[in-house]
């Protein structure tokens, strides 16, 4: 990306990844030998390996393949492909969470551009709005929301409208018109929600599965093993619903009382 443009104002920027994935990566090896297994690009008809530079893109049709060269895709990329073009400003709350994808940070390309960068950041924060923009990255066009976030400009990639599935069409008859719960059950469920209300702090949450995977690797490396995890809870039967809700509320309130006693 070369610049961010809003109206007649533009600022040269750089794009940085905002999230670091911590997924433990495994390699494919052969059972018994431990030999590394690698994948190759192979001609399906001849069985011969194909050099990377000879690989192009093909779109399947009834008559065969429509062959498209990477250079042809570059030639038809939208204009200003390296520009984050802001087309309007919206309240971020208007965008449903299902539309959000990855997050990036924007930084000015040099110290001479910090004033314009800072102006856009402060203007977005003051107006409490997000800029809706489009840009092209890696031969693909993206829709994005630009927002002032923690003294930087954050770019939230968004799904296009036709990428988001209609839940009523996808889930169909499995969606109930109403829960069928009694007023007493509803009140108890609301009480449970209120009893479990907390302040959001992302540092309180950790990927315990990845921690368990690492513990398994460490245990096997030392010649040991790891105990299985806790089994999933059983499903709540409809006849037990009120009892389960009441017990949950009491448990949540007891936990709150214990937290207060320790502070």
From Swiss-Prot:
GO MF term (any one): double-stranded DNA binding
Disulfide topology: none
InterPro entries registered for this protein in UniProt: Ku70/Ku80_beta-barrel_dom (IPR006164), Prok_Ku (IPR009187), SPOC-like_C_dom_sf (IPR016194)
SMART domains cross-referenced by the UniProt entry: Ku78
Domain named Ku: residues: 6-169
Keyword terms: DNA damage, DNA recombination, DNA repair, DNA-binding
CDD domains: KU_like
Pfam families, per database record: Ku (PF02735)
Protein's job: With LigD forms a non-homologous end joining (NHEJ) DNA repair enzyme, which repairs dsDNA breaks with reduced fidelity. Binds linear dsDNA with 5'- and 3'- overhangs but not closed circular dsDNA nor ssDNA. Recruits and stimulates the ligase activity of LigD.
Subunit structure: Homodimer. Interacts with LigD.
Family note: Belongs to the prokaryotic Ku family.
Family annotation (NCBIfam families): Ku_bact
PANTHER family xrefs: NON-HOMOLOGOUS END JOINING PROTEIN KU
Name of the protein in question: Non-homologous end joining protein Ku 3
Natural source organism: Saccharopolyspora erythraea (strain ATCC 11635 / DSM 40517 / JCM 4748 / NBRC 13426 / NCIMB 8594 / NRRL 2338)
């Amino acid at each position: 990306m070369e610049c961010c443009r809003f109206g007649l104002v533009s600022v040269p920027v750089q794009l940085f990844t905002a999230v670091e994935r911590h997924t433990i990566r495994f390699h494919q090896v052969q059972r018994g030998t431990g030999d590394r297994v690698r994948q190759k690009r192979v001609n399906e008809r001849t069985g011969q390996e194909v050099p990377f530079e000879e690989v192009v893109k093909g779109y399947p049709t009834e008559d065969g393949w429509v062959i498209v060269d990477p250079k042809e895709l570059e030639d038809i990329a939208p204009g200003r492909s390296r520009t984050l073009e802001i087309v309007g400003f919206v309240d971020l709350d208007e965008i449903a969470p299902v539309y959000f994808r990855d997050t990036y940070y924007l930084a000015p390309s040099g110290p001479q551009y910090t004033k314009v960068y800072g102006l856009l950041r402060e203007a977005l924060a003051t107006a409490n709005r997000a800029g809706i923009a489009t840009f092209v990255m890696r031969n693909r066009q993206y829709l994005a929301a630009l927002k002032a976030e923690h003294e930087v400009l954050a770019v939230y990639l968004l799904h296009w409208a036709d990428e988001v599935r209609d839940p009523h069409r996808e889930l169909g008859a499995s969606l109930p018109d109403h829960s069928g719960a009694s007023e007493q059950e509803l009140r108890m469920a609301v009480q449970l929600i209120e009893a479990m209300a907390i302040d959001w702090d992302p540092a309180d949450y950790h990927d315990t599965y990845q921690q368990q995977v690492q513990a398994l690797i460490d245990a096997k490396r030392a010649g040991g093993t790891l105990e299985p995890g806790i089994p999933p809870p059983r499903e709540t039967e409809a006849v037990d619903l009120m009892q389960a809700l009441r017990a949950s509320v009491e448990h949540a309130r007891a936990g709150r009382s214990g937290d207060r006693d320790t502070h």
